[in-house]
Amino acid sequence: TNVLRGCGVVTAGKIVGFQEGIIDMSGTGAQYTPFSQLHNLVVVCEPIEGIEKHAHEKAVRMAGLKTADYIGKLAKDITAETVETYETPSVKEGIRLYPDLPRVAYVLMLQSQGLMHDTYVYGVDMKQSLPTILCPTETMDGAVLSGNCVSACDKNTTYHHLNNPVIKHLFEEHGKTLNFVGVIITNENVYLADKMRSSDATAKLCEWLGVDGAIVSQE
């Protein structure tokens, strides 16, 4: 996968309700955001009059995605300055390679509570999905797309999913102190019955993978 490291795409403009957010590119605030270190291409989206709110959110989300896709393709045929290799053996192969290391999974909880609080996996709204297993590199390649536009700075953007620090750290320890078996994605739905269903299914997948432990991150 070719990556234009140091580049970001930011969508801006009016959205449903007031959801202001500021990216400090200099000064004290810049120390607390990864985006201050990027060359950001800002896509300003102005809605047409009378557009339905769900259609508005989707249009802005897809505008950012298509822009990132277009820019990313510019790197398709260039020679990389640096190359990083991430090994993702199968569950069976991992047991053979690292029989004495603890088996660890990463449970990635994804926001899924309605308009402005949604996450999409391969285009599917996570509200409609049961927990499932992803290869860690799938998140790096863009499998998880954020639709969160509420409360700037306390939600995971698509950039965070592409550059998930938990996955990166687990890869660094893989084969040394632990056997990183994979990522289990689950949702964060509103109703109690949905929460219980997802929790039970996540626990079942962890048991099925035979993990010794799991790291859980909540959005």
Residue ranges and their predicted role:
Residues 1-213, 218-219:
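Metallocofactor- and cofactor-centric catalytic cores in central/energy metabolism, strongly enriched
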